[in-house]
Each structure stands twice: as C-alpha cells, then as structure tokens.
C-alpha cells in the first residue's frame, strides 16, 4: 500500500523538459504582458500627444478665425470711415466748386461792369480831349446846322468849315460829295439835318483807319519800332504803350534807341521804373546796336513785346533817314521777321503836314501803323480825314491827354461822335 502511494507521487512530479517549457512559457507570457503594457502606455502617450496637438490646432484655428474676424471688422470699420470721409469730401468739393463758380461769375460780371465803365470813361475823356476841335467846328457849323434850306450857299459854308479844320482838299471833296449823295438819297431839306449826313460821311471816310493792333500768339518777342520827329511824343507814347500792354498781361522790354539825346534815355528809364519794365540802353553807341541788344535780351528772357525807341528826325534829313533804315535792317538780323510793327508817332498840332511826314516815313520804312498824339491840344481834328484820303495807314492809337491811360486804340465811331456831337 505504501508502495502504491510512493509510485503515484513520483508520477505527478514534472519532467525536467516540461519544467523548462513551463518556465519559458511563463517568461514569454511575462514578456508579452510587458510588451502589451508598453504598447498600452505608448498608445496612451500617443493619444495624449495627438489630443494635445489636436487641441492646439483647434486653438490655433480658433485664434486665427478670431483674428480674421477682428481684421475684417477693422477693415469694415475703416471702410465705413473712409466712405464717410469721402462723402464729406464730395460735399466739401461741391460747396467749393459752387463757391468758385459763384466767385468766377461775380468776377466776370465785375469785369464786364468795369469794362463798360472803362468804355464810358474813355468816351468821356475822348470827348473832353477833342474839346478844342469840337468847339471850333461847332462854332463854325452853327450857321450851317442852324436851320434854313439846304442849298449851294449852305454847301459852300460847310466846305469852308471842313477845309479850315485841316481836312485837305481831297478829303473835303470826298466828304462834300458823300454829303450831297446822302442828302439827295434821303431827300433831306433842312440844314439841321446835315449834321447826321456829315457824321456818317466822316465815319465812312476814317473807318478804314480803325485797325487795332493784334498781337500774335507766339513764343518769340513781338518787336515794335517807333519813329517820328522830335517833340511828337514818341518816348511818352512808348511809356504809355508799355502800361497798356502790361494791362493785357504781356511782359514788355524797352529799347532806348534815341542815342542822340541823353534826356530821351533818361525819360525812357523813368517810364521803365514807373512801369517796372527793363530798359536796355547804352551811354555810347548807335541806335541800331541798342535795338539789337534789346531784341537779344528779350529772346533770352522770354519777353512778349519789345518797344524800340529811335532818335527823332525830320524826313528832309536824308542822312538820318538812312540811319533809321539801318535800324530796321539790324532788327531784321536780330530776328528775321522783325520789326513786326513800324509805327510813326504824329503830333496832331502839325495839321496837314502830318500827311507829308507819313508819306516820307512810309516810303523809307514801310509803315504798318500810326499813333496820333496831342489831339487834346489842337483844334485840328480833321487831320485823320486828311490821312484817310491821302495815305490811309492804320491809326493804331490816339492820345488825348497827359494821363498814362490817355493813349487808347483808335475807334472811328467814338472819334466822330466826340468830334461832332
């Protein structure tokens, strides 16, 4: 019996190989468990990391969204402010434009009113300036226009009045024929109706002289050469012309070409200072050289107008007439088409002798215009009629006073009205 139990106990004891296997299995199970544990830990760590990254990404995206929202909100706010400012600027611009237009309209209206006042002022000065001529003619014509029938005796009286007013024979004959034709055409009978006929006849005669000087639009200087006898008023006329052109927005330069008289140079320099205009002069040298230098200076400085004075001379002084021809030639060398205007200044006091002067200077230089001065100091207003009939060179300007504004473009209608009204 004891032996039976001993055998059984011997059978339950594992064999060495089996024990080794079990040990290996246990070891493997332990390692597997460890691996599983490690994997589990790694998985949990990875999950935590991914979760953190996801949460960070979500947070970043949320922040970006908020930033975009804020940026968009700021942009919208700025856009609204810009729109409001733009609207305010548009309104301000509208108001400014309206104000500017209003001011411009006011300035235009003021300029028109000033122009009308100026016209009236000039008409009054012209009428006052022609007082001596008008009074003489009015006194002489009183008997003609005083009534009575129009007959040959009346025509003879009218003819005498015209001749004594320095309307030479040619002009007088033209006017008498024109008046007779108007009387016949209109069936005029009474002597007081002759005034209207004479006014229209005189206007038609001198109207061709009314050709105002028109300055071309050019970048080159416009050169005006002035000539005449001593005492005609050349230098004074140049000073007044400078002021006149300045009022038109033109820049002016003066050439003191009267080198024979120191007083003429000083007088022109005084006008230059008065008008704030540059004067080109030389203490020595001839007139042509001064005028040449003046044109060169004007070209270099971009001046609009050059007014070139020359020495006074009588048409009978042949050597001086040759000298003034030289001035013209030298000006042509300074500028190929200069002088653009050649003007003779006439003293109205010399009466019909003015026609001879115009003919002489015209033959020598080829005149383009006249300035008739001192009409306020003479009773010889008929000089323009004589010029119109004998040598109709355009009368650019007339002077009826000592004032700086008393030199103005010739207006035939205004002249006739001032002379005969």
UniProtKB/Swiss-Prot annotation:
Region (Disordered): 1-22
Membrane topology recorded in Swiss-Prot or TrEMBL: Peripheral membrane protein
Main subcellular location of this protein, as a coarse class: membrane
Biased composition (Basic residues): 1-10
Gene Ontology cellular component list: cytoplasm; plasma membrane
Molecular-function GO term, any one: GTP binding
Pfam families the record matches: SRP54, SRP54_N
Origin superkingdom: Bacteria
Cited SUPFAM superfamilies: Apolipoprotein A-I, Domain of the SRP/SRP receptor G-proteins, P-loop containing nucleoside triphosphate hydrolases
Family matches, as InterPro entries: AAA+_ATPase, P-loop_NTPase, Signal_recog_particl_SRP54_hlx, SR_rcpt_FtsY, SRP/SRP_N, SRP54_GTPase_dom, SRP54_N_sf
Keyword Nucleotide-binding assigned: yes
Reaction(s) catalysed by this chain's protein: GTP + H2O = GDP + phosphate + H(+)
Enzyme Commission number, as recorded: 3.6.5.4
Statement: the UniProt record of this protein carries the keyword ATP-binding: no
Residues binding GTP: 228-235, 309-313, 373-376
Keywords: Cell membrane, Cytoplasm, GTP-binding, Hydrolase, Membrane, Nucleotide-binding, Receptor
Entry's family note: Belongs to the GTP-binding SRP family. FtsY subfamily.
PANTHER family with a match to the protein in the record: SIGNAL RECOGNITION PARTICLE RECEPTOR SUBUNIT ALPHA (PTHR43134:SF1)
Task of the protein: Involved in targeting and insertion of nascent membrane proteins into the cytoplasmic membrane. Acts as a receptor for the complex formed by the signal recognition particle (SRP) and the ribosome-nascent chain (RNC). Interaction with SRP-RNC leads to the transfer of the RNC complex to the Sec translocase for insertion into the membrane, the hydrolysis of GTP by both Ffh and FtsY, and the dissociation of the SRP-FtsY complex into the individual components.
Record text on subunit structure and interactions: Part of the signal recognition particle protein translocation system, which is composed of SRP and FtsY. SRP is a ribonucleoprotein composed of Ffh and a 4.5S RNA molecule.
Protein name: Signal recognition particle receptor FtsY
Annotated source species: Neisseria meningitidis serogroup C
């Amino acid at each position: 019996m004891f032996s039976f139990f001993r055998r059984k106990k011997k059978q339950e004891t594992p064999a060495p190989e089996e024990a080794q296997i079990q040990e290996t299995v246990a070891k493997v199970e332990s390692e597997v468990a460890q691996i599983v544990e490690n994997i589990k830990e790694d998985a949990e760590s990875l999950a935590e990391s991914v979760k953190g990254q996801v949460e960070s990404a979500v947070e970043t995206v949320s922040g970006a969204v908020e930033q975009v929202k804020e940026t968009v909100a700021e942009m919208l706010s700025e856009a609204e402010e810009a729109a409001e400012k733009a609207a305010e600027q548009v309104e301000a611009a509208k108001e400014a434009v309206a104000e500017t237009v209003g001011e411009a309209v006011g300035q235009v209206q003021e300029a028109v009113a000033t122009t009308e006042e100026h016209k009236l002022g000039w008409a009054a000065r012209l009428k006052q300036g022609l007082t001596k001529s008008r009074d003489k003619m009015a006194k002489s014509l009183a008997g003609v226009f005083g009534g009575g029938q129009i007959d040959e005796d009346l025509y003879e009286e009218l003819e005498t009045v015209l001749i004594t007013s320095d309307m030479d024979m040619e002009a007088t004959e033209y006017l008498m024929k024109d008046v007779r034709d108007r009387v016949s055409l209109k069936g005029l009978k009474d002597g007081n109706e002759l005034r209207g006929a004479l006014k229209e006849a005189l206007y038609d005669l001198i109207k061709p002289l009314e050709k105002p000087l028109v300055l071309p639009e050019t970048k080159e200087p416009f050169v005006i050469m002035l000539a005449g006898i001593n005492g005609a008023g050349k230098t004074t006329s140049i000073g007044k012309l400078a002021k006149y052109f300045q009022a038109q927005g033109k820049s002016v330069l003066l050439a003191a070409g009267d080198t024979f008289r120191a007083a003429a140079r000083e007088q022109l320099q005084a006008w230059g200072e008065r008008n704030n205009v540059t004067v080109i002069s030389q203490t020595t040298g001839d007139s042509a050289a001064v005028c040449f230098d003046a044109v060169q200076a004007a070209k270099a400085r971009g001046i609009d107008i050059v007014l070139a004075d020359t020495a006074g001379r009588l048409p009978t002084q042949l050597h001086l007439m040759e000298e003034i021809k030289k001035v013209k030639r030298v000006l042509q060398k300074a500028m190929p088409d200069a002088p653009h205007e050649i003007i003779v200044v006439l003293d109205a006091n010399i009466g019909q002798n003015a026609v001879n002067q115009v003919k002489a200077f015209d033959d020598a230089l080829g005149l383009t215009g006249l300035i008739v001065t001192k009409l306020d100091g003479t009773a010889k207003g008929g000089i323009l009629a004589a010029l119109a009939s004998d040598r109709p060179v355009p009368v650019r300007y007339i002077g009826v006073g000592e004032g700086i504004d008393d030199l103005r473009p010739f207006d035939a209608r205004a002249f006739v009205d001032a002379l005969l009204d």
